[in-house]
């Protein structure tokens, strides 16, 4: 009887541990590489950005570091920092009540000649770049709306300072946690 209870208890504990691992995102091929304010950035989000820059380097006839090398890890981690920045922008925009819709992003992509109709993919590097730019424009408009100045030059300078202060505060106050081996460095 005691052996049976022990076996049942072991099965229950084992199932709970397995469920916990699966619910936390472990046990699959898309590990979290960083968390921004609790929002995960996964390997499947990072890989296309790395691939984009690998292809850009190849198109320009420039070398790209080999996978697994120290130089590759430095480049990969800097690109992860870009994804962290974009996530911080999306979170800040949401707090301010501003957004960029998928339609707006695709229109901007098509207007810039970066994409053909139907070509813009939600997870593409170009899509993320345009989305971040639209969000930054809207964040800027929101946080600088009440600023006044005697000249256009002074107005631009005051707005730039206000936006810089806001973005510095966002970066300072947003909790970012990198998984081991992924933190950007010097």
Task: Locate predicted features.
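Basic side chains
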Residues: 4-5, 76, 86, 138, ...
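Short, low-structural-confidence N-terminal segments
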Residues: 1-74, 160-186
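A ubiquitous, low-specificity "background" feature that marks scattered single residues
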Residues: 20-21, 110, 132-137
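Acidic/polar surface patches and capping/hinge elements
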Residues: 121-125, 130, 137-181
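Proteins with a high burden of low-complexity, intrinsically disordered sequence enriched in S/T/G/P/A and R
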Residues: 8, 115-119, 123, 150, ...
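N-terminal targeting/tethering segments
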Residues: 27-130
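Hydrophobic membrane-targeting alpha-helices
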Residues: 18-22, 92, 142
